[in-house]
Amino acid sequence: MANPPVTEWKQSEAIPAHVAQETGCFTTLPIRIHKNNSIADQATLESINDWKQHLDDGWESRSGSAISKVGNWCSFIFSEALPERLPCITYLANIGNIHDDATEDATLDEAITSHAQFSTALSLDTDDEPSLQEAKTRRFRHLVSNCVLEILSIDRDMGTRMIVSYQKKWLDVMEHLNYEGIESLEEYLEFRMLNGGMEPFWLMCQFGMGLNIPDAELAPTRHIFEPAEWALVLTNDYWSWGREYNASLTKGSRIVNSIELLSRLRNISYDEAKEVVRDLITTYEAEYERRVQDFLRENPSTQMYLRQFIEVAGLVVAGNHYWCANCPRHHAWKEQDQAVHAVDQLEEFPAVEAQSPSSATHTAAPQEDPPVTEAPSPISSPSSSSSAKPSSSSAADSSSCTSTSQHSPSETDSTPPSSLHLLKSPHPVDAPCTYMSSLPSKGVRSTLIHALNQWFQISSRNVTLIKEITSMLHNSSLILDDIQDQSPLRRGKPAAHTIFSTAQSINSSTYLFVRAMQMVSENFESSVQMSFLEILQRMHIGQSYDLHWRFHLQCPTEDEYFEMVDAKTGCMFEMLLLLMSSKSRHVKDHSFTSFIRTFGRYFQVRDDYMNLTSGEYTAGKGWCEDLDEGKLSYPLIECQKMAPASFTQIMGIFRAKQADTAQLSDETKKYVIELFRKSGVLDSTLDWIMEMERQLLMEVKRLEGVMGDSNPMLYVLLQTLSLNQ
């Protein structure tokens, strides 16, 4: 650069340019490697061993490892990561590499399914795709759960942002664009920005550096990152070309590479196209440098952390280039038909400890690619046709109000003959339920089912069935709750009864109970049916006490409150436990009673607390909606014990509210919240929640001992719900 960066790099050390050039590397940018390369190597080996343990499909040894004789890939691309954060992002990056390699030889449909399974395993707060093969998804989930848990424990806000982007902006889109339809280099680069997951990659860099820069603050710098990303894409294409071309000849693998594209579009040889790509790489590197200089000159007061992140992009480009020029991942095919196993690589290249670049061996010269002077007709796998589409046939393809044919094959035969058109679906009774199912969900029940299935190991069909039954009951209860609470909002959208009428919504809600019971009777033994009905009975009794206390302004004791919670909230979790254990050959539910009861109580009190304090809840349900309802929640019970005078005032507000259907004014709500805060009620409630979180962690440890198997996904669920900032 004309004006070299003044950033002080703390975690990395320089690789001399002449050392890099001796290996064939031609980047024009400065190269740095993390001082703790051994940390990255260890995390890489753990990811390889874990892949073998949980998936055991051979790709842990067939995939080219991040380890190389010049250093670990992640030591170059995360060269300024904090040492304590380097292991988890290295682990996640290498798992992504193995997964990417494993899908290269798959058909397009198979690749999309595999990406969806991996994406589902990373899901933190949404219901996943029920048509996926449960066993494969479960193995993916067990593979990544410990890594996800570590990420969230280090930095939950940035970790969540990073993981969601990794899931939504890479795995969910990487195979959904048609490479064969691309007609220009610009389209190709845009395609690879999604296919290569650039957004989640930069978030991983931020996480590693301990940053969490808002998108709005980064937006003015977006143009700087573009040429860096283009150089990254073309660098990978340049050095992976020989491997990809060889795989297309020997295995019929798909080629997705700018060299093939330029050869095809410009009618030039592969060798000529490769030279074009080489020139473009250095051109884009120079453009990146120019844009950095211009931005810093025009914005001299740029915050140091933002400047550092901008300049790290150049280190990423250069470090990735140096690694690509030397890594077994791109070059081992020249000596054998698969990459060297990472353990063997470590033995051959023992430079796993941090060392001075001058003392390391950086002299290996690259071998030439296969001589190809003219481009033959493009080689493509039959699976890469643009007409290929993922198949999706499952119980979740239609509304849970109506998707029952797979559970009742004789339903049509058993229906009494009738000429009435009204008996044919869809019915008006389905509409409120379909609407509720379309609203965003936190997905706690779904995540809990999948986490427990690590132990229960029931089939994919039964997982889908149980999710559908519990979803019906949950949606039914939400429809009724909104009516009983006179709530105008549900998950940030209009409540069902405000759209379909109160009468129709009540009818739809009760119909869902009937449908759920019908599905249970068709798929479970009579003893399970009886237990299911008993749980439904307790759920309604629990709800009746909640309504009774509210109407009569009768504040329960803490013991009475939790008895109500065990019935109203806990029974839903108890129900999924009943259904899962009845389909499992490995587990019965008696060992889980304490965990489920504690989880139900924790979930309800957490909900009570968040309703009064969370901006997220305000967006979904309205501000302090429990106060509008006059709900006798846990904080109010605490207030009765801790501040009787404040309790009397709040009950007076609720009593006056009963004669007025309007919502409480913002001023009144602020006053009530201030009473809670000054009396220590909110702090006391949060302390109780923290104690329940500790108890739940102890319960999971106990269950792991009983089951003889760890369950990191349960820890991830508890971490995502945790209020321990």
Swiss-Prot record:
- The entry's substrate-binding residues are D100, N236, S240, W241, G242, R243, E244, R329, H330
**GO molecular function, one example?**
metal ion binding
According to its UniProt record, the EC number is 4.2.3.-, 2.5.1.29, 2.5.1.81
Motif NSE/DTE: which ranges?
236-244
- Belongs to which family? In the N-terminal section; belongs to the terpene synthase family.
Q: Which cysteines are joined by disulfide bonds?
A: none
Annotated signal sequence is none
Protein name as annotated: Sesterterpene synthase btcA
- Which stretches of sequence are listed as region Disordered? 352-426
Motif DDXXD 1 is found at 100-104
Q: Any idea which positions bind Mg(2+) 2? A: D100
- Which positions are annotated as binding Mg(2+) 3? D481, D485
Q: What ranges does the record give for the region Prenyltransferase, renumbered to this chain?
A: 334-722
- Coiled-coil boundaries: none
Gene encoding it?
btcA
